[in-house]
């Protein structure tokens, strides 16, 4: 147990594929509507790279936000308790820093879940069906000025040109 006054807090670690499977299993059990985007989707598409979080684009109904919240309560630190009910509507990204970090988004580069639906590929990992953004869907969110997005764009361009 961490003493609240010792200046040392809990630290998150980079997520593993096993973490993703555990998270998605909990989300699926709650009936949450979401898609995995970002680094984990890039890894699933075949680009070997590290990621510091799991990015989720979620459907924004109040009911779905509650399903996501309940699923995140299954994580060890239950860090989602610090999230306010309207945070996903108020902020571009809501970072849940539990044992590993989950970034929740209602929109990614102007795109909401309804607009993303056609670009979702369901992939089974360890018996858990996980909705990943396909390379075509990942293209738009990667149009940023970040260095790591430059590398992702080069990979996606190659993947999309091969199709």
Per-range role (PLM):
Residues 1-163:
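Compositionally biased terminal segments of proteins
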